[in-house]
């Protein structure tokens, strides 16, 4: 089979598969172009690394890049969930059934050994969740995060946690392995932290007890007030550490306004008249003291915090998935993280009240 025929056969399977995945965050009817295919394991089953470019309807949206780890076998993998199976395509060796390799234990372990050639991993399980990445637990000791949406340049989740680890900040889990190609970060491995849960789960449990028992908050065993105060202190320590690791400058109100207008335009997508909101944003340019501008988490909330032992740990520093990579890495006001966390508390309260 020539390369053009192979690419056409694979592309026909990839478009519907991508659109059905929870981690996929681009156009619902993608135009897929295969940019690279590498074989990480030959034979049956094979392990393929595939880089694809995805464009939106009629090419209007900016292209996005996704990496796929695909398995190929001579028999249909009926034991895997339907959402993990792409279908069959012809090859010189006969029909090959394609599937998400990270859903298959054998191939997921093979890929983990690609990331860490010294690893002797024997067990793997996937973590649930609707993210732009896939997380695998290895031997209940390590966490392998595989980025699905990729782009040229460092991934903030790798860049920030590596930098914070170098200065000794304890509120993040520093990488032990990073798998990259050229200048693109593709996967990161960290030690698995033992936790009591995320801030979101602990806050919801606290509110459920409060609403059901009708006792004063201080009389509830799961009261989250003290934990919330400790979490706030950890966020403050994070910002101090980020300023130390990446530097701090006086915030530019005009630049912050431009950033907010750009984000507003993406959210509104021409469906709302944003003129009055933009006028309010423009007033930032006249502010005399906007505080400091530093690297920030970018999408902070209760679900991005883990309660460990006697402290809190903050995770998932990719930033907002809808923002271009350059914007995610741009310094901003630490109040952006504070606003994200505050909004998260509101969402949790609303969810608990609705139950």
Regions found by a protein language model. Name each.
Residues 29-43, 49-53, 284:
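Short amphipathic beta-strand and strand-loop transition segments with alternating hydrophobic
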Residues 300:
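Hydrophobic HxD+1 residue recognition
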Residues 47, 54-265, 269, 309-311, ...:
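Conserved ATP-binding subdomain of kinase catalytic cores across diverse folds
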Residues 292, 296, 304-315:
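Conserved protein kinase catalytic/activation segment
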Residues 1-34:
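Short Lys/Arg-enriched alpha/beta "domain-start" segment
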Residues 5, 9, 255, 272-275:
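Alpha-helix boundary/N-cap detector
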Residues 119-123, 261-296:
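An alpha-helical support segment within catalytic cores of ATP-dependent transferases
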Residues 26-39, 120-128:
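Short secondary-structure junctions
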